[in-house]
Amino acid sequence: MDSVAFEDVDVNFTQEEWALLDPSQKNLYRDVMWETMRNLASVGKKWKDQNIKDHYKHRGRNLRSHMLERLYQTKDSSQRGGIFSQFANQNLSKKIPGVKLCESIVYGEVSMGQSSLNRHIKDHSGHEPKKYQEYGEKPDTRNQCWKPFSSHHSFRTHEIIHTGEKLYDCKECGKTFFSLKRIRRHIITHSGYTPYKCKVCGKAFDYPSRFRTHERSHTGEKPYECKECGKAFTCITSVRRHMIKHTGDGPYKCKVCGKPFHSLSSFQVHERIHTGEKPFKCKQCGKAFSCSPTLRIHERTHTGEKPYECKQCGKAFSYLPSLRLHERIHTGEKPFVCKQCGKAFRSASTFQIHERTHTGEKPYECKECGEAFSCIPSMRRHMIKHTGEGPYKCKVCGKPFHSLSPFRVHERTHTGEKPYVCKHCGKAFVSSTSIRIHERTHTGEKPYECKQCGKAFSYLNSFRTHEMIHTGEKPFECKRCGKAFRSSSSFRLHERTHTGQKPYHCKECGKAYSCRASFQRHMLTHAEDGPPYKCMWESL
């Protein structure tokens, strides 16, 4: 009797045909093929590789690889384990081209193979391949997972899950790798050898794939597209990370919070959020970080490096996302549109903060006094009132600031610098926010509208104060007399009636005033033409 070949009993579907089957049809296919495999195993038949090369040479992946992966999806793990173990004894993984079966066994041999190869690796890299611990007898089949893989790389990566071993130790940092190729690539990061240099910004790279991905940050090319939503990406890693949003699944899952990840490195970085581990330390200031990219970005605050330059105006940035956000100033692109009022924003973060003006959500609460805020910068700014400290301090007046941008704006109050000039009237301002608000006096724009009465306002603060007329809210209460106010400015003016403070002094006559409006009215009396409004009425 002729030997039975796999092709004699196989019920095959192409990838396209398989995708069209419903779940019940797929289950029927699995049942039939499991029974077929069981029968072959029971009579001791091996799968032959007759005409495999010719028959499948135009296929991207081997037929048997597809079949095994489909069978592995069965719910009955005891069924697949038993069948796979029988075929493994017949060297199934060697008989099926392109497929390796994970046996979850710790081998006694040096895992890279022949001793001559290991000597060669040691001579060239100076790194001794590790040996797996010898366990003696083969483990029980029930503890083996038999998961199939179509590539050696995927198979070796998966084995690490069972063995916990990696093959090569880096002598510089102690990091371990499971292949010579990967440790060679890693060693370059210590040597500083970066032969691939970007012609646009001069940034150098140690590996061609990283260099090509970087080039796309300048060209805008995004060759990898999500099949689910059409979103495009510059590298395959980004699209894999994105796909988790659609599938909700990844090969690595956090045991603490359940978040899935597409790669081992991303998963390990995430774990440090829970453990608090920060192994990457800045040599300049000692600040520690959970991953090396974050450290590299931080180091630019010390070096002043700004590798990302705007082609339109030449402004340079330390971070690529900052450049991308800046470019929208030139293009006018505002992809984030508020459904409530139609206002559009350049960045997702400012859009989210804006949405809270409609919902009233204030997720950030001060631990000292309980006051709540809609965004972190507002809370940090508030915290300075309690601590009296901030990372940035004015050298002239000693005022502390929570972030660099308001600190820079404040410095201009001392230097007199006003870099933002109104195109309509020529008036200059210290910040971009101030000029945007001022421009509304020319355009008449009033983006903040009261839902109660329809009245519109140019400024958010005016709108918020107006809303309190309807709600009756008066959050600022005087501790001396109990009088309450809607706005902090009105409250501060009132406090001066108790303290007697008069911070506005006339240089002409020395007279002092408690509020700016009274002071400005007084100053008109010293003007050359006198006050602008004079009563012309003559008594009879």
UniProtKB/Swiss-Prot annotation:
Pfam family, one: zf-C2H2
Domain (KRAB) ranges: 4-90
Location of this chain's protein in the cell: Nucleus
Cellular component aspect of the GO annotation: nucleus
Zn finger spans (C2H2-type): 140-162, 168-190, 196-218, 224-246, 252-274, 280-302, 308-330, 336-358, 364-386, 392-414, 420-442, 448-470, 476-498, 504-526
Gene Ontology process terms (BP): regulation of DNA-templated transcription
InterPro entries: KRAB, KRAB_dom_sf, Znf_C2H2-type, Znf_C2H2_sf, Znf_C2H2_type
Protein name, as recorded: Zinc finger protein 136
Record lineage: Eukaryota, Metazoa, Chordata, Craniata, Vertebrata
